[in-house]
Swiss-Prot record:
Record-given protein name: Ribulose bisphosphate carboxylase large chain
Chain sites annotated for binding substrate: N123, T173, K177, R295, H327, S379
Cell membrane among keywords: no
GO molecular function, one term: ribulose-bisphosphate carboxylase activity
Misc: The basic functional RuBisCO is composed of a large chain homodimer in a 'head-to-tail' conformation. In form I RuBisCO this homodimer is arranged in a barrel-like tetramer with the small subunits forming a tetrameric 'cap' on each end of the 'barrel'.
Localization of this protein: Plastid, Chloroplast
Site residues (Transition state stabilizer), renumbered to this chain: K334
Classification via InterPro entries: RuBisCO (IPR033966), RuBisCo_large_chain_AS (IPR020878), RuBisCO_lsu_C (IPR000685), RuBisCO_lsu_C_sf (IPR036376), RuBisCO_lsu_fd_N (IPR017443), RuBisCO_lsu_N_sf (IPR036422), RuBisCO_lsuI (IPR020888)
Pro-peptide positions on chain: 1-2
Length: 475
C-alpha cells in the first residue's frame, strides 16, 4: 500500500458496520416546513431496539446502506439523510411502535410520485431487521405538492361541466363485468343513463378483451350517451376505461374518447402505475376530459394492519398524480371501510386544509394549497336502503355508484336507475328540510316509495341484504 493510500484511508473514513441509530436517530431534530414527514408502524425483530429499527427505516429509505462507504465523504449526509425524529408506542401492541421520519425535499424528483414512493416505500419494506412495516401517513409540504398538476379539473370544474349542483352524483358499474358484447354493453349503458343516472362505468377488468374490443365499446357507449342526453336533457357520461398494456396504447384510447366528444375516461391507477396515471392526467387536463380512477389492487397493499401502506397514503398520492374521482369505500356496503377512518381520507381527497386528527387516523396536518380536490366514489354492495346513510356520510361532493343495486332491479336497468334517482332526490330534499337522515332514513325511503313503483320494487328486493363483518381497518 502506498503512503498516499494510507493517508487517505486513515482520514475521515473507517470501514465496517455501525449502528444506524448513531447517524439516523435524531430526537432533537426540529422538522422543517419543506420536509416530507412519514409515520411508519414498525414491528422489529426480537432483540432490535425501537431506536435502531426506526433509524434503520430512515436510513434504508434515504441515504443509508448496510455498511460504511468511503463515498459518504463526498457529499453532505446531514443535508440529505432521512431522520427518525420521534418514536411512540402503539396502544395495545407490545411489539409495535410508530416511527416518525423526516426526509429533506431534495431527495425527491419534482412532480414524480413514482420517485417519491421508490424511496419511501422501496427496499426498506424487505429489511430483515423488521418483522413488518407499514406506512400510516405522509405529510406532503406545499413546496413539493406545488410541483404537481394534480387532478385534471377538480370538483367545482366538474360540476360546472356537468351543470349539476346540490346533490351527490349517481353512477353504476355495468354488470356482468365481463362477457357482454359491445352492442349489448352499450344498450345497458343507455338504459341506466336514461333512467336518471349521471354516469355509468366500465368495470376495472374491462380493457380490450376478445369478447369486446375497446374501440367497439367506446363507439356503442358514445351512442348511448348521446341518445340518453337527447331524451333527458341532462349531461351524461360513461367512464371509458383507457387502461392498457402500454402508456402509448392508453393515450391512444384517451385520444379516441376525446374525438368522440365524451366527457370522461377512466384509469386503474395502481395496476397501471403512477407514471402512466400522471401522463393520462396531464392529457386529460390539456384536452378537457374528466378522469375517473379505480383503485384495483389497493387491498393487496393496504388491508394488512401491520405491513404495507394505508389507503390514506395512496389517496394522497392519487391527488398528486391526478384524478377527478377515486373509489374510497362505502362504510355501509360489501367492501372494507370503517366510518371515521374512511371520512379521514375522504377529507384528504376533497379539502384544501386538513388538521391532524389521530381519532381519524390523520397523523399530520396537510395543506394542499391550490391542488384541486377529488370526488370520493362510494361503490360496492350498496342499494336504495343505503341511500340515506350514504348521503349523510359522504355529503354532496361524492359519487354514489350502484352496480348490482341498479342492474339487479326486478324490472330491468332503467327502472333500477329510476329507483336510485328517486331515493337520492328524496334524501337530499329531506336533508335540506332539516330532517335527520341517520334516524329517519328508512321512513324517508318508504314515503318516497309510495309514489314511485320502481323504488317500491327495489325496496322489496333488497330489504334483507346486509354485509355485516367487522372492519379490518381500525386504529
Amino acid at each position: 500500500m502506498s503512503p498516499q493510500t494510507e493517508t487517505k484511508a486513515s482520514v475521515g473514513f473507517k470501514a465496517g458496520v455501525k449502528d444506524y441509530k448513531l447517524t439516523y436517530h435524531t430526537p432533537d431534530y426540529e422538522t422543517k416546513d419543506t420536509d416530507i414527514l412519514a409515520a411508519f408502524r414498525v414491528t422489529p425483530q426480537p432483540g432490535v431496539p425501537p431506536e435502531e429499527a426506526g433509524a434503520a427505516v430512515a436510513a434504508e429509505s434515504s441515504t443509508g446502506t448496510w455498511t460504511t462507504v468511503w463515498t459518504d465523504g463526498l457529499t453532505s449526509l446531514d443535508r440529505y439523510k432521512g431522520r427518525c425524529y420521534h418514536i411512540e408506542p402503539v396502544a395495545g401492541e407490545e411489539s409495535q411502535f410508530i416511527a416518525y421520519v423526516a426526509y429533506p425535499l431534495d431527495l425527491f424528483e419534482e412532480g414524480s410520485v413514482t420517485n417519491m414512493f421508490t424511496s419511501i416505500v422501496g427496499n426498506v419494506f424487505g429489511f430483515k431487521a423488521l418483522r413488518a412495516l407499514r406506512l400510516e401517513d405522509l405529510r406532503i409540504p406545499p413546496a413539493y405538492s406545488k410541483t404537481f398538476q394534480g387532478p385534471p379539473h377538480g370538483i367545482q370544474v366538474e360540476r360546472d361541466k356537468l351543470n349539476k349542483y346540490g346533490r351527490p352524483l349517481l353512477g353504476c358499474t355495468i354488470k356482468p363485468k365481463l362477457g357482454l358484447s359491445a352492442k349489448n354493453y352499450g344498450r345497458a349503458v343507455y338504459e341506466c343513463l336514461r333512467g336518471g343516472l349521471d354516469f355509468t362505468k366500465d368495470d376495472e377488468n374491462v380493457n380490450s378483451q376478445p369478447f369486446m374490443r375497446w374501440r367497439d365499446r367506446f363507439l356503442f357507449c358514445a351512442e348511448a350517451i348521446y341518445k340518453a342526453q337527447a331524451e333527458t336533457g341532462e349531461i351524461k357520461g360513461h367512464y371509458l376505461n383507457a387502461t392498457a398494456g402500454t402508456c402509448e396504447e392508453m393515450i391512444k384510447r384517451a385520444v379516441f374518447a376525446r374525438e368522440l366528444g365524451v366527457p370522461i375516461v377512466m384509469h386503474d391507477y395502481l395496476t397501471g402505475g403512477f407514471t402512466a396515471n400522471t401522463s393520462l392526467a396531464h392529457y386529460c387536463r390539456d384536452n378537457g376530459l374528466l378522469l375517473h380512477i379505480h383503485r384495483a389492487m389497493h387491498a393487496v397493499i393496504d388491508r394488512q394492519k401491520n405491513h404495507g401502506m394505508h389507503f390514506r397514503v395512496l389517496a394522497k398520492a392519487l391527488r398528486m398524480s391526478g384524478g377527478d374521482h377515486i373509489h374510497a369505500g362505502t362504510v355501509v356496503g360489501k367492501l372494507e371501510g370503517e366510518r371515521e377512518i374512511t371520512l379521514g381520507f375522504v377529507d384528504l381527497l376533497r379539502d384544501d386544509y386538513i388538521e391532524k386528527d389521530r381519532s381519524r387516523g390523520i397523523y399530520f396536518t396537510q395543506d394542499w394549497v391550490s391542488l384541486p380536490g377529488v370526488l370520493p366514489v362510494a361503490s360496492g354492495g350498496i342499494h336504495v336502503w343505503h341511500m340515506p346513510a350514504l348521503t349523510e356520510i359522504f355529503g354532496d361532493d361524492s359519487v354514489l355508484q350502484f352496480g348490482g343495486g341498479t342492474l339487479g332491479h326486478p324490472w330491468g336497468n332503467a327502472p333500477g336507475a329510476v329507483a336510485n334517482r328517486v331515493a337520492l332526490e328524496a334524501c337530499v330534499q329531506a336533508r335540506n328540510e332539516g330532517r335527520d337522515l341517520a334516524c329517519e332514513g328508512n321512513e324517508i325511503i318508504r314515503a318516497a316509495a309510495k309514489w314511485s313503483p320502481e323504488l317500491a320494487a327495489a325496496c322489496e328486493v333488497w330489504k334483507e341484504i346486509k354485509f355485516e363483518f367487522p372492519a379490518m381497518d381500525t386504529l
